[in-house]
Structures are given as structure tokens and as C-alpha cells.
């Protein structure tokens, strides 16, 4: 099982890598400028967070050209929405804070996770409109699209950072993503 983490210059990308490694996955933190051809043998990708949609390198190509499960974290979630025709805009709250997220749709990504969890998130930017072919999985009082997934492909996005200590059930979420990658 090989799941790579795409480094988008986010402060928590190394924690995603460590979480996957601790869960027994062969993983590597790779630059977002890595050619698509060098990622053809992975079983899944995590598109990490970062400061700017303008600095996501080849991530759009990864989303369009690779046929593997992917999860976008924060900026990765926003990029996924944008690439597939959704809208991203300023959130009502900048900076990081604890947010209560409600899971509104059953999905294997949230298997064994309570319907309401407290997570660590920034809402400087957020997904404002779902892309066509995606469905909303979670919401909060400050953001209507905290998590989403493609209706047919194993493409997921979450606004929060499951890899940080402040987020409840983050390890479980990554464990569930690993199971999705095994299928």
C-alpha cells in the first residue's frame, strides 16, 4: 500500500505523512511539482494544505489524470472543488480555530466516526458551491461544505485538518481513507 502526500507548503503536511506512516502505509512527502508519470504507481494521494491556490503546482493534473483515490485537505479540498467546477471564496472566519462539524451523509470515509466531531480548521477560504457530480458529506455553523466526495469516483475533500491533535477522530478518518485505497 503506497499513499503519497502532496506537499503544498502547508504547515501540517508533515503530520499527514507521519500519520500515514504510523498506520503502516508506505508513504512519502512529495513536491507538488512532481511529474504525473512519477505518481502512476501509487494507491492513493493526499493533497495537502497550503497557503495559496496559486501555488499548487501540478495538483490539477493529478486530479484530472490519475485514477486513484484522493483526499484533499483544506487547500486540497478547495482545489478539488475548483478543478471540477465548484466555487471557492472567502470564509466568514480567518485563522485556525476549533469547529464543530456535523456529518450529514453516511460514507465509508466516516465509518465509525460520530455524527458530530470537533475539528481544527481555517476558514480563510472555503468551498462555497459544490462541483457538479459531488455531494456534501459534512457541514458546520460557519461553513456549509466542510466535506464532500465525488458521486462515482473515490475523490474526497475535507476543510479541516484531521492530522492535527486538536481534530477528533483524525486517525480514524485516515485509516478509513487507507481502506478506500485498498479497494
From Swiss-Prot:
Enzyme active site: 74, 161, 163
EC numbers, comma separated: 6.3.5.2
UniProtKB keywords: ATP-binding, Glutamine amidotransferase, GMP biosynthesis, Ligase, Nucleotide-binding, Purine biosynthesis
GO terms for MF: ATP binding; GMP synthase activity
Gene3D superfamilies linked: 3.40.50.880
Broad EC category: ligase
Superkingdom per UniProt: Archaea
Keyword Ligase applies: yes
Listed GO CC annotations: cytosol
The protein's annotated pathway: Purine metabolism; GMP biosynthesis; GMP from XMP (L-Gln route): step 1/1
A Pfam match: GATase
Catalytic activity: XMP + L-glutamine + ATP + H2O = GMP + L-glutamate + AMP + diphosphate + 2 H(+)
Residue ranges annotated for the Glutamine amidotransferase type-1 domain, each copy included: 2-183
Keyword Transit peptide applies: no
Complex and partners: Heterodimer composed of a glutamine amidotransferase subunit (A) and a GMP-binding subunit (B).
UniProt cross-references to PANTHER family, sorted A to Z: GMP SYNTHASE [GLUTAMINE-HYDROLYZING], GMP SYNTHASE-RELATED
Role: Catalyzes the synthesis of GMP from XMP.
Annotated protein name in UniProt: GMP synthase [glutamine-hydrolyzing] subunit A
Organism lineage string: Archaea, Methanobacteriati, Methanobacteriota, Archaeoglobi, Archaeoglobales
